[in-house]
Amino acid sequence: MNRRVVITGMGIWSCLGTDLETVKQSLYEGKSGIGMQPERLEYGYRSALTGIVEEPVITKKMLDRHTRAGMPEEARYAYMSSLQAFEQANITDEYLRENEIGCIFGNDSSAKPVIEASKIMDEKHDSAMLGYGLIFQSMNSTVNMNLSTIFHLRGVNFTISAACASGSHSIGLGYMLIKQGMQDVVLCGGAQETNFYSMASFDALGAFSVRMDEPTKASRPFDRDRDGLVPSGGAASLILEDYEHAKARGANILAEVVGYGFSSNGGGISQPSDEGSVVAMTRALEMSGVKAEDIDYINAHATSTHQGDMYEAMALSRMFGGKHALISSTKSMTGHECWMAGASEAVYSILMMQNDFVAPNINFEHPDEYSEKLNLAITTVETELNLVLSNSFGFGGTNSALVLKKFKE
């Protein structure tokens, strides 16, 4: 079986905005969502830079106290983005009760509830003091377990923990399940906590930018003077659906998923690889039946680290050198949204494709010997987009690439 897979709904909760229209405008304007959180320095961080993500307000009219008690920060973000996605897809509560829908979400940590539980045990020496919800908050699968129970989802249900490629792999696997006829509709996405507990060990690697005098200029993918990434987070949700199923229920189709590629570098745990990136991109193109010259835009993984950007630039130059595809990293505006990044960047890419523009790679002022070979969009470019490639790479050498297509009957 080889079914077409389309996207019928999207939702976003990020530092660029908490609805699709606001995020689209932020992308078009090249608006940064990065700021300072001084308590990070007090806690012992080298850098106070972070994406500033609005805290969701989930009232008792939306969810009862019992449910909210089991929801950590990242699950709350994902709940809000999934509400948006179901609404755009015109999937009602009644539809959810009467039809099987799956859920595959990317998430790779839930640090705050784990640390809070440890503090309570150290202080009180009594597990009864932990209360009801912390066990459900503490598991990597917390987003899936919350979404599946809140929305009464009865299809496939598991979490992808694949570092910073988690959100992208979730879309890829949802795509494969629908393509092969195993599911009709799958809620896919990624979520990332933003609390300062969650990123302390990342800061310890010296991977974060310390350009604290200019927060909005700190994330500068591919720029010669980049000094590290800026952590960020939130959630992104996408409704993937079999084309015939979507057509039969009169759904509005936003885009089509036509290719998914993956690979593993097989090297050092934090060592990027141009070869692994090329394999993932090549597989995605082959599955989609398109060539490198057919791609109009590439949403690069580039996080603003020296090695990561260098190796991706090498891979992109090998595959797309001399081709017309424009390249930018939306992380220049969002910072690195980690576990959600592959999903949020799919949303960002689709918003660009729907509105025929390429968001800029802001803060790119000086190329280095690798990025000077790339066709980077450093300002907003209005141009027709029919095929886009979105890259996501992560610790442990995991690589994912998605090819998304403007929908045509």
Regions picked out by a protein language model, each given a short descriptive name:
Residues 21-28, 112-128, 177-180, 201-212, ...:
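A glycine- and small-aliphatic-rich helix-loop capping segment at beta-alpha/alpha-beta transitions
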Residues 4-8, 31-36, 213-288, 297, ...:
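Condensing-enzyme catalytic core mediating Claisen C-C bond formation in acyl metabolism
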